[in-house]
Amino acid sequence: MSRFWTDKIASLDPYVPGEQPQDKKYIKLNTNESPYSPSPKAIEAMALEVSERLRLYPDPNCATLKNALAKSYQLDANQVFVGNGSDEVLALAFMGYFAGGKPLAFADITYSFYKVYAGLYSIEPKLIPLNDDFDIIPADYENLDVSGVVITNPNAPTGKALPLADIEAILKANPDVVVLVDEAYVDFGAQSAVSLINQYPNLLVVQTLSKSRALAGIRVGYALGHADLIEGLERLKNSFNSYPIDRVALVGATAAVEDEAYLKEICDKTIATREQSVKDLEALGFSIIPSATNFVFATHPEKNAEQIYLTLKERGILVRFFGSNKPRIGNYLRITIGTDEEMAALTAALKTL
């Protein structure tokens, strides 16, 4: 701790990302990265950009990417905001739409960065408990005196998806505040709320290229919503960093968005492997929460999750253990869906425990 720290710095409880050990080669099933390469078209576009154009600043408006996303989602370009990963997009949304003095509602078990943003912007979290089956109950989001609502769909780390009708019920119950729907994993089996954007001016949908498009390394995320909401994010961005996306990321992201056939191929492969992995894990006695993501959330009634995590790590396989002190999920493991070969290696290792 430095004597130059402000009270704000000292009060922060920063996000702890999944471990990235460098001591040896691991089968990485802990950070929900894609086991597959990005679109070949994206790789080709990025290689060309590296070789010829890095002396130039990127387009601060990210016009080509916004146009590609707008076309993909059947929106106007002014309904698209682009940022340096969905985490930056979320941070700007929290700053701009939720730091208004009232609490912000989100689930008690969800993406842990929300609490970090709340602390950073002095927002009081209003935690809405998931039910005993780890479901979000729309009725719990009615009659709230809050600055906004954040819903993760599918939820993380549980992997459960919320039907579109439930998202709409939450929107109807909160017409005077922004409802942010974080859809980082939506391509793996959930219903997107994008179709509701033109009907609900308070809806902001946030997505990423890190998961289904296998581009975690270039850090590109985006928000979709009513043009007025997007304009607010643009004002914040241009008051902080006018060039959030570098030239290489911009061309790679655009090519990936345009390659919808490759997106479908990756998602289909991941879903098929996930369903087989669920069967394999259940055969070993694990209980699996139904998943619409590229991971599964698993617990074993007779085995300690922390010990499983440590043993797997010793054998070169990384899974995510959030800590035995976490209420309700202290004996769960989050397991990213890898290739068929990687998941077979996981199953083989678990059989020996």
Swiss-Prot record:
It catalyses: L-histidinol phosphate + 2-oxoglutarate = 3-(imidazol-4-yl)-2-oxopropyl phosphate + L-glutamate. Its EC number is 2.6.1.9. The keyword Transferase applies. Pfam families: Aminotran_1_2. GO terms for biological process: L-histidine biosynthetic process. One of its GO terms (molecular function) is pyridoxal phosphate binding. It is an enzyme of class 2 (transferase). Pathway: Amino-acid biosynthesis; L-histidine biosynthesis; L-histidine from 5-phospho-alpha-D-ribose 1-diphosphate: step 7/9. The modification N6-(pyridoxal phosphate)lysine is found at K211. Keywords: Amino-acid biosynthesis, Aminotransferase, Histidine biosynthesis, Pyridoxal phosphate, Transferase. CDD domains: AAT_like. Its cofactor is pyridoxal 5'-phosphate. Homodimer. PANTHER family: HISTIDINOL-PHOSPHATE AMINOTRANSFERASE, HISTIDINOL-PHOSPHATE AMINOTRANSFERASE-RELATED. Belongs to the class-II pyridoxal-phosphate-dependent aminotransferase family. Histidinol-phosphate aminotransferase subfamily. This is Histidinol-phosphate aminotransferase. It comes from Marinomonas sp. (strain MWYL1). The gene is hisC.
